[in-house]
Amino acid sequence: MVKKVLVVEDHHDTSFLLCRLLKTEGYEVEHAIDGMVGFNAAESAPPDLIVTDIQMPRMDGIEMIKRIRGSKDISRTPIIVMSAYGKRLIDDALEAGADAFIEKPIDLDSFLATIKSKLPSV
């Protein structure tokens, strides 16, 4: 069964790279440009895992995580957070309910290993 990953990232180059990498690895991938679009996408078609940036327009990743954790249908979806902005944001994201944190710039091998470790088994 193909696993679905939702990538929530506002920077085009980063989202393009991550989506392409995940598709190459055999995942079904959906992309959202900010936390609001990401939350709505996750609610309407729940993914197996969410990868999100923290700092985005309209709704940031931390607010999106809080809403997901408060949502009945998607509250247990694993969430991996990406950011280049240091320890305070890492702590905020983990406190909000993120399951893992990846620093930018992203090491692609580490990224894929984290994805595989957080996806639920079938």
Residue ranges with predicted function:
Residues 106-116:
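C-terminal output helix
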Residues 45-51:
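Active-site beta3 strand of CheY-like receiver
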Residues 16-24:
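Charged docking surfaces used in two-component/phosphorelay signaling
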Residues 56:
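Receiver (REC) domain active-site loop signature in two-component systems and cognate sites
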Residues 9:
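Conserved acidic carboxylate
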